[in-house]
């Protein structure tokens, strides 16, 4: 089971307790049916403030530790933080476009393959 909870919770102004609860519920549901879980971490832009930005990223790290899931710390590495970020996003500057997909695949694939190995 691959879980990627994007930054929409932050964009909607939800408290981190809600984000954490949403993530916990998804992981617990997957684990309740014995699914192996890969958690794809997300970050929010720095304009949310240093503390919130760090706390948001930490939600994924903490959930991975708590439930023993595999984790890709930041699914958009090389997309959102790279020199070509502007051309890798749709006009909304929030959602990656088709050019970003191979980079995102490269970010997730090694962890996914480890989970799928016998």
Where are the regions that the model predicts?
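Alpha-helical cap/lid subdomain in secreted, periplasmic
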Residues: 1-118
